[in-house]
Amino acid sequence: MFFYVLLLALMAQGWSLPQGKTGEDSPVFRPPSPPMGPSLPPPVSHDLHRPSGHPEEFRTGASLPPKETPNEPRHGRPKRDLHHGKVVPTGVPHHTGEVLHHTDCSSNTHKSHEENRPKGFRTGRPLLPIKPEHGRHRRDLHHGKAVPTGVPHHTEKFHNGSNGKSHPPRPGHSTSAHNDNSSEEKRPKHGQEQGKKH
């Protein structure tokens, strides 16, 4: 914007000469510039260390920024404020050289957390979710053909008859090895009448 105003001021000096004079008689001779559309500024050289592309009239007079020193950060930000990668603001203050908590640790006698914690007190840690493998937990998996049903599986105490409970025999399953003969005689066999006993 400043270049635009400066260009207009220079052009106004060139055009303000009287009609009869060509400008050669004036103490500073400037050739009339060709008409430039809507007053565009001259092309700017991006080489800041060699401003030879700028005519003296277009210089602003402002000094160039000083060369960078090793302690000076680039782009005006301190190096400690620069973050590399994705930074998510968490609201947690960053640790500095000072430790704000535990200011007087030497006077405190530390007790273990178990001694300070009342019974039934839970820690603030979230419990880890139990992820069953393939729908069932590893210790629930059976080796071999296991059909998951809602009925609890029978253990050895039901089959050895030590607790007094006995199960009716399954069809096609021999019960003589598991039960004694006296209990087998009391039960009627399949296909026999209830009134007849052996």
UniProtKB/Swiss-Prot annotation:
Key word Cell membrane present = no
Signal sequence segment: 1-18
- Summarize tissue expression: Expressed in the periphery of the cement gland as well as in the region of the hatching gland.
Query: Has keyword RNA-binding?
Result: no
Subcellular location, record wording = Secreted
Q: Name one GO cellular component term.
A: extracellular region
Q: Residue spans with biased composition (Basic and acidic residues)?
A: 46-59, 95-104, 181-198
Q: Where do the record's region annotations for Disordered lie?
A: 17-198
Q: Where is the composition biased (Pro residues)?
A: 29-44
Q: What is the designated name of this protein? A: Protein XA-1
